[in-house]
Amino acid sequence: MKLFAGNSNRVLAESVAQYLNIPLGKASVRRFADQEIFVEIQENVRGEDVFVLQSTSYPANDHLMELLIMIDAFRRSSARRITAVLPYFGYARQDRKPGPRTPISAKLVANLITEAGASRVLTLDLHAGQIQGFFDIPTDNLYAVPVIARDVKANYATGNCMVVSPDVGGVVRARSLAKRIDAQLAIVDKRRERPGESEVMNVIGDVSGKDCLLFDDIVDSGGTLCNAAEALLNKGANSVTAYITHGVLSGGAVARIASSKLKELVITDSIQPTNAINDAPNIRVLSISDLIGEAIARTAAEESVSSLFD
């Protein structure tokens, strides 16, 4: 077994390698003057079980192209099996046609990874479960819930916690956390009462006096989270903390979170945190390196991965 990494999340890759007690593989990923990407594998991988870790986060197209070229390099170097380890799968929110004459980009990206030569995929908290079926190769979708539940139990009196889904579509995900910490579930329902009016946040469930835990897979602009936190506090919640797997946090999101009524935003390192995120007073990062490392170890040993979540 050998583990390699592109440039998107070297810190996580090094932590995973440490968990596995193996060195991170030697590979050069660099750019020519015209910004074309060039990859050189700097050690023998013939007959090896290769894992290449790369989040296709911002800049998504550069990191995706790095991944595809690395997979091709391993295939042409006679690796026995190539597993693409994608802690964050970019383009996941483009999983359906939003209107006529539009693409399903998540399916296209899955095809590209497969055609480049990947034998299987390991990823984390896909935005939509059906994306797992977009790949024509074995694909394991890991869940951050065990890591998050452990952190909740260490920091909160779970008897007073209420898990909240920030929208109707995330209820199944939120319920999985609520079940693990034995908490009740509430939902924030966004709707426009009349055309042309601003969105209204309706809270389904009694959150009065509760420590509310918003749980979702992606935070991007942060607007929905901040508005949901305000709605919950207006309904009498004691505090609001957000647990989110993938901290995209684009644009002015970090500043928006810092000035919001959220007690804390907790994200994982599926996307490498920026300096601004690390310096933010109310943003904390949980590592998923042990989870990813254990999934890799079990895959290499041909053992069950799903039993990690039993």
Swiss-Prot record:
Listed EC numbers: 2.7.6.1
GO molecular function, one term: ATP binding
Main location: cytoplasm
Cofactor dependency: Mg(2+)
Localisation per UniProt entry: Cytoplasm
PROSITE patterns xrefs: PRPP_SYNTHASE
Residues that hold Mg(2+) 1 according to the record: 127
GO cellular component, one term: ribose phosphate diphosphokinase complex
Recorded metabolic or biological pathway in which this protein acts: Metabolic intermediate biosynthesis; 5-phospho-alpha-D-ribose 1-diphosphate biosynthesis; 5-phospho-alpha-D-ribose 1-diphosphate from D-ribose 5-phosphate (route I): step 1/1
GO terms classed as biological process: 5-phosphoribose 1-diphosphate biosynthetic process; purine nucleotide biosynthetic process; ribonucleoside monophosphate biosynthetic process
Residues annotated as binding ATP: 34-36, 93-94
TM regions (residue ranges): none
Residues where D-ribose 5-phosphate binds: 192, 216, 220-224
Description of how the protein assembles with itself and partners: Homohexamer.
The name this protein goes by in its record: Ribose-phosphate pyrophosphokinase
Gene: prs
